[in-house]
Amino acid sequence: MTVAGEQGETEYGSGPEVIVQIADDVPPEHRDAIRASVQTMARRSAEASTRAVEESTAQTKLMTAMAGPLHKLIEADNDASDALAASNPSPEDYRPDTPMQEPAWPTVNLVEGKLPATELDFVASQVFGAPWHYQWQWHNGQPPTISSQDRTNGQIRMAVHADQNHNWSDVHGGFGVALRTDRVQAVAGRSLRRTDHTYFVHGGALGGNATVEGGMEMTALEDGRLVSAAQDKRFRRRLSNGERETLGFQGWTTGEGIEVNWVMLPGRTYTFNVGAWVFGEAHGGVGTASIAQAQLNGLVIALTAQFTD
């Protein structure tokens, strides 16, 4: 289904819940490549997430099987049974309402043009900023509690919640530009990004576990075929057997330096993307709950490309 809107057009694809929004002024010859690129990224992430969850589920089954006899001993002792109950949170007590308050977004003053050389002598041939040519989002597993992208300013907000009843959620979203060339060129692509995040993780006792993870990622694709990818993982936490941890927002930090490299050929459309992801997974122990919830706010300030003939 295609829905036209003031900001472009929205594509609802198959597979993961995929939404692509393309600006009205993007040339028609770029649109198919943009859609194909987002579908490729979504399939790739779905396969990776599914593998990770399957491995974790299999491991949890082994751990809870071993914890079963211990659970029977605990139930036979009043003090131990009370202690287990006290350590076991209710998922509903930790399910967050969708925050309505906007983050205090950093101020951005982007000056387009060539960037000065760095210590690595990287001189950008072209700098891209908002408004981006298109934006995209998808999720795997349970729907996210927040998934918001705005290509006009580069702002991203996303959050997930998982517990033993809804044991995983994986959300991705971001922006991109479409490029063409009239000659063979090598490209080195970088990005300037800022993020802030928060999470709560509780791994249930007696074999339970919970994981949160998030960060930002860059990709380059040729006519929808992945040619380069890089990740900047901003956080990951996995707890088990009654462990619990809360991290509040710490303030905006600049992303680590990552780079994608590829070769551009005439007659093809290249998509250069930057986005964010948040993942949460929770598996309860024997008679216990596990909870994983996380939120990431991201700001994409610029994409830079260095072209070499």
Q: What is the predicted role of each segment?
A:
Residues 2-309:
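Mature extracytoplasmic or otherwise solvent-exposed domains
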